[in-house]
């Protein structure tokens, strides 16, 4: 079967990763130590996309856990699903990256990277037919951002024809935990533009908003945020993990979603968003799911798609859903919001179905959109970057690890290019190629 190797790097990546494994273990009927006690053959059928089978009905995640300090790893190990992971797959340093991208990418991280690649290689060799890699990390820190992007480029070198998907937590405008986030994020985006095939952008602020507005949680914890992220990750990977009517793998997703190679940054959303205790009190319908899924308040990246246009998008419905109803609803959304979809890609909405709903829900839907409005997010980070870089603030932390100012300048301009590429396609229309013949057009009108 088509296996995926999962990597999680840094504190954020490991916490999101742990939540993801907890969610999908539940969906596949595995308990905290990886023993299968599920009820349906469907849970087993494509188990090997994410799990290796060990002896005695036990399944082990094909996950590599990486960090430059032992703290988060110990927390994962002590957590409810800590016994799930293979002990050899924990790779950690002792020094930490101290939120410094250069430490993760060039000094501390570079020392650890070969050790990680050995584990990755071992996992890849055990695969029947590897389809690709997915990595969870944040872009604002040192390890997830710096070392995460280093791993991506090394894996790219060694497995050039395999897919590379990233779940990247982008720094948010209001919720910031380090001053140098804009530097780390810009340097990371510079790498992701070149080396990733699909990047799902998640942003803490949008998650906070969802928790407060929709889930009515007065002070959300990181646990609540990670719960949301794991719901989306579980949704995005559904088609890979369960046999469905419209199956897909990482490559099919990319083929449908990425019209131009650099524009592979997706917004994700999930429905129904209900607070953890309340979901059992009412039934959800397909129209409600569709409406909620396309609601800007549901997007897990702080950019409003109404300020841009969708190049492509994809919706994954789970549960006992009628195909016809889904098709009708999706057509309906497109007709109502026709101005938010570019008209030069016909049929740019893709739907997939899977009959197994997530735990505790009758049906759900996950949304992945490639919208030009994601440029807001890069613009925001870029402005903060420029403000600091103009004064060369904090640069000595990076140059001290051997980085060059030139690299900052390159990263900045690459990100600005990305923003203007999105802008260009936002404004593009079908008739652009015909502007060279104004005379003929006027003749016809007479």
Swiss-Prot record:
Provide the residue span(s) of the region labelled Disordered.
425-446
- Superkingdom as given in the UniProt entry: Eukaryota
Q: Does the keyword GTP-binding apply?
A: yes
Asked if the keyword Repeat belongs to this entry, the reply reads: no
Instruction: Give any Gene Ontology cellular component.
Output: cytoplasm
Compartments in which it is found: Cytoplasm, Cytoskeleton
Record: residues binding Mg(2+): 69
* Residues given in the record as GTP binding sites: 11, 69, 138, 142-144, 204, 226
Protein keywords: Cytoplasm, Cytoskeleton, GTP-binding, Magnesium, Metal-binding, Microtubule, Nucleotide-binding
Cofactor entry = Mg(2+)
> Any idea which GO molecular function terms this record carries?
GTP binding; GTPase activity; metal ion binding; structural constituent of cytoskeleton
Q: What is its main location?
A: cytoplasm
Stretches of Acidic residues bias are at: 432-446
The record's comment on protein family reads: Belongs to the tubulin family.
Its job: Tubulin is the major constituent of microtubules, a cylinder consisting of laterally associated linear protofilaments composed of alpha- and beta-tubulin heterodimers. Microtubules grow by the addition of GTP-tubulin dimers to the microtubule end, where a stabilizing cap forms. Below the cap, tubulin dimers are in GDP-bound state, owing to GTPase activity of alpha-tubulin.
User: Which proteins does it associate with, and in what oligomeric form?
Assistant: Dimer of alpha and beta chains. A typical microtubule is a hollow water-filled tube with an outer diameter of 25 nm and an inner diameter of 15 nM. Alpha-beta heterodimers associate head-to-tail to form protofilaments running lengthwise along the microtubule wall with the beta-tubulin subunit facing the microtubule plus end conferring a structural polarity. Microtubules usually have 13 protofilaments but different protofilament numbers can be found in some organisms and specialized cells.
Q: What is this protein called?
A: Tubulin beta chain
Species of origin: Blumeria hordei (Barley powdery mildew)
The organism that produces this protein has a lineage beginning with:
Eukaryota, Fungi, Dikarya, Ascomycota, Pezizomycotina
């Amino acid at each position: 079967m088509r296996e995926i190797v999962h990597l999680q790097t840094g504190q954020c990546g490991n916490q999101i990763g742990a939540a993801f494994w907890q969610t999908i273990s539940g969906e596949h009927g595995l308990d905290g130590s990886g023993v299968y006690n599920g009820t349906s053959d469907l849970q087993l059928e494509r188990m090997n996309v994410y799990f290796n089978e060990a002896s005695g009905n036990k399944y082990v995640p094909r996950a590599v856990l990486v960090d430059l300090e032992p703290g988060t790893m110990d927390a994962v190990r002590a957590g409810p699903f800590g016994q799930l992971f293979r002990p050899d797959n924990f790779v950690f340093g002792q020094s930490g990256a101290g939120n410094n991208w250069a430490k993760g990418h060039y000094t501390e991280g570079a020392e650890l990277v070969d050790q990680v690649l050995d584990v990755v290689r071992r996992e890849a060799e055990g695969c029947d037919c590897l389809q690709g890699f997915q990595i969870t990390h944040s872009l604002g820190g040192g390890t997830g951002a710096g070392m995460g992007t280093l791993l991506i480029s090394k894996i790219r070198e060694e497995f050039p024809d395999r897919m590379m998907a990233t779940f990247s937590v982008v720094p948010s405008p209001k919720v910031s935990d380090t001053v140098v986030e804009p530097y780390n994020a810009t340097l990371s985006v510079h790498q992701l533009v070149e080396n990733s095939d699909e990047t799902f952008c998640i942003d803490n602020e949008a998650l906070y908003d969802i928790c407060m507005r929709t889930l009515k949680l007065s002070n959300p914890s990181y646990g609540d945020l990670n719960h949301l992220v794991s719901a989306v990750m579980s949704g995005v990977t559904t088609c890979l993990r369960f046999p469905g009517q419209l199956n897909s793998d990482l490559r099919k997703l990319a083929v449908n979603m990425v019209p131009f190679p650099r524009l592979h940054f997706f917004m994700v959303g999930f429905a129904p968003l209900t607070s953890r205790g309340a979901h059992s009190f009412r039934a959800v319908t397909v129209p409600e799911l569709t409406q909620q899924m396309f609601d800007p308040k549901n997007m897990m990246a702080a950019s409003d798609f109404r300020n841009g246009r969708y190049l492509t998008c994809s919706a994954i419905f789970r549960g006992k859903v009628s195909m016809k109803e889904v098709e009708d609803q999706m057509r309906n959304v497109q007709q109502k919001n026709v101005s938010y979809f570019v008209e030069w890609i016909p049929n740019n909405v893709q739907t997939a179905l899977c009959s197994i709903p997530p735990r505790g829900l009758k049906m759900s839907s996950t949304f992945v959109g490639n919208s030009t409005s994601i440029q807001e997010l890069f613009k925001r980070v870029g402005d903060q970057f420029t403000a600091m870089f103009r004064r060369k603030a904090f640069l000595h932390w990076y140059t001290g690890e051997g980085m060059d100012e030139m690299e900052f300048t390159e990263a900045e301009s690459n990100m600005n290019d990305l923003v203007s590429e999105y802008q260009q396609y936002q404004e593009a229309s079908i008739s652009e190629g015909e502007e060279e013949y104004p005379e003929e057009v006027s003749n016809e009108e007479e």
